[in-house]
């Protein structure tokens, strides 16, 4: 999970649109924070989650469109590894699939597409541009702001569903 989380975020999977990876990471971390508080698992690490989220907020504030800084692999790898560590410390590793669903889908579909093509010679995703945010920008006509906002809404809805499932 640690490697998968890091790989889905890095290497231009979700860091190609200004603010997308940072916004989705903040939503994911806040979901983990809430779930940690509900499950009462790891109170001490919650401060680290909040600190990381605040640092990302500062980055997003400074780097609002048009971006001034390129996050690069160093930042996106750090976000992926931190999400993986936070989820593992929560002792509910399968929650990762819900709280980071958009990051997984955005980065993971490219891995699925390449794997299907290379190993099984299946061209089922031939007309899909990966990562997904590039597909909706180029074929759907979405602007960068629309991509960030709509992907964030999708992740918030999925995260709220995960929180609700834990509460019942």
Model-derived regions, located:
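Short glycine- and acidic-residue-rich catalytic loops of nucleotidyl-transferase/cyclase enzymes
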Residues: 1-4
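Alpha-helical transmembrane segments
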Residues: 6, 10-13, 17-168
């Amino acid at each position: 999970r640690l490697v998968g989380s890091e790989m889905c975020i890095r290497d231009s999977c979700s860091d190609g649109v200004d603010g997308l990876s940072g916004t989705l990471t903040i939503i994911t971390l806040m979901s983990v924070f809430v779930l940690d508080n509900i499950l009462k698992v790891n109170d001490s690490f919650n401060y680290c989650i909040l600190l990381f989220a605040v640092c990302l907020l500062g980055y997003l504030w400074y780097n609002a469109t048009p971006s001034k800084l390129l996050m690069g692999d160093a930042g996106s790898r750090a976000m992926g590894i931190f999400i993986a560590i936070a989820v593992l410390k929560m002792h509910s590793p399968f929650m990762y699939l819900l709280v980071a669903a958009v990051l997984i889908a955005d980065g993971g579909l490219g891995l699925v597409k390449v794997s299907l093509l290379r190993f099984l010679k299946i061209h089922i995703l031939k007309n899909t541009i990966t990562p997904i945010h590039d597909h909706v920008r180029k074929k759907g006509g979405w602007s960068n702001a629309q991509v960030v906002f709509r992907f964030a809404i999708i992740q918030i809805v999925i995260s709220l569903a995960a929180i609700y499932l834990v509460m019942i």
